[in-house]
A protein has these predicted regions:
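A solvent-exposed, charged loop/short amphipathic helix patch at secondary-structure junctions
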Residues: 57-82
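C-terminal catalytic histidine-bearing segment of alpha/beta-hydrolase fold enzymes
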Residues: 47-50, 81-86, 91-170
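Short linear functional motifs in flexible/disordered or boundary regions
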Residues: 38, 59-61, 106, 167
Length: 170
């Protein structure tokens, strides 16, 4: 399951909370959970996350100059006035819950280096699941908008390599 912006927020909230046992993997794009909607998956699942470093709608980090700073519960206040959980804090919380290796390794793709594209892999998660986070210099959109279609092939390759298996419950 994949979703962009609000669709990615759906994945980070309701899909993780209620559908994790039915999904092999998820691929949220340019999204982060809203404050108060960041449940942990009830069963482990693989995640590939794409986020533009220049996203001013749902910020990747609180350091973007157009953000309004940090909000309650260590959220970032975006220029739209919403409070979003900081992306890497949320992923770290999920990875800790799924007992992933704390250190990341490079996750090579055919886009590496293009516009700063880099992907990091955390493996060793419960049930053999993995978490990948990819980012580059683009905004609130699918990676590189419609100039490149490689983002979807990276997502699809990840999902094909993480089929549904019996998952240990928590």
């Amino acid at each position: 399951m994949s979703g962009v912006s609000n669709g990615g927020m759906f994945i980070y909230s309701r899909a993780m909370e209620r559908l994790a046992g039915s999904l092999a993997s998820v691929g949220p794009v340019c999204s982060a959970p809203l404050r108060g909607y960041n449940p942990l998956p009830d069963t482990p699942l693989s995640i590939i996350d794409f986020h533009g470093l220049n996203d001013h709608t749902i910020p990747f980090s609180p350091e973007l100059p157009t953000n309004l700073g940090l909000g309650p519960d260590n959220t970032v206040i975006a220029n739209d006035g919403w409070y979003y959980h900081i992306k890497m804090d949320h992923l770290a919380r999920i990875m800790e819950h799924m007992h992933c290796d704390p250190e990341s390794t490079e996750y090579p793709t055919h886009m590496d280096g293009s516009h700063g594209w880099v992907c990091s892999l955390w493996s060793g998660c419960d049930g053999g699941k993995e978490v990948v986070q990819c980012n580059a210099h683009y905004g609130h959109d699918y990676p590189f908008h419609n100039r490149y279609i490689e983002g979807i092939s990276i997502l699809w390759d990840f999902m094909k390599s993480h089929p549904q298996q019996a998952n240990p419950g928590y």
